[in-house]
């Protein structure tokens, strides 16, 4: 009986490791976004190039999409974690398959992740700031 409980705990630890990596990737992407956008804004300000403000929106959109993908993966693995918690000890098979086909609900969709509060507030604020600075510099 103890061995079976250990198997379940190990499986949950494996899933938790993936969830932690997804959260860490999301955090790193946000850092890269701020760094890259700050660099482009500094360059745009020093050269008085209004077009660089719009160019800064391109990496924002790319990183927003990537970050949403990581959030989606994190949510799918959280669903897998809950599923494994509910499994009986004898049914543990160490499956790491967390697909939308199995766990697909509204919360586990790319668009829902893209427009989630954390993603939308962060990336929209950055994009809006870039465009607002462009209009402030142009006038």
Predicted features along the sequence, with ranges:
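Membrane-targeting and insertion segments and their boundary/processing signals
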Residues: 6-13, 43-58
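Hydrophobic alpha-helical transmembrane segments of multipass integral membrane proteins
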Residues: 32-39, 57, 61-64, 128
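Inner-leaflet juxtamembrane helices
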Residues: 52-103
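A hydrophobic membrane-anchoring alpha-helix module
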Residues: 92-139
């Amino acid at each position: 009986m103890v061995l079976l409980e250990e198997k379940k705990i190990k499986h949950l630890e494996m899933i938790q490791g993936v969830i932690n990596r997804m959260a860490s990737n999301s955090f790193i992407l946000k850092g890269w976004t701020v760094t890259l956008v700050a660099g482009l804004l500094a360059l745009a300000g020093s050269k008085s190039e209004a077009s660089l403000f719009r160019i800064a929106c391109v990496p924002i959109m790319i990183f927003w999409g990537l970050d949403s993908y990581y959030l989606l993966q994190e949510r799918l693995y959280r669903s897998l974690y809950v599923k494994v918690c509910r499994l009986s000890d004898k049914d543990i098979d160490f499956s790491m398959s967390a697909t939308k086909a199995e766990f697909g609900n509204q919360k586990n969709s790319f668009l829902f992740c893209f427009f989630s509060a954390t993603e939308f507030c962060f990336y929209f604020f950055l994009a809006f700031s870039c465009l607002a600075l462009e209009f402030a510099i142009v006038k």
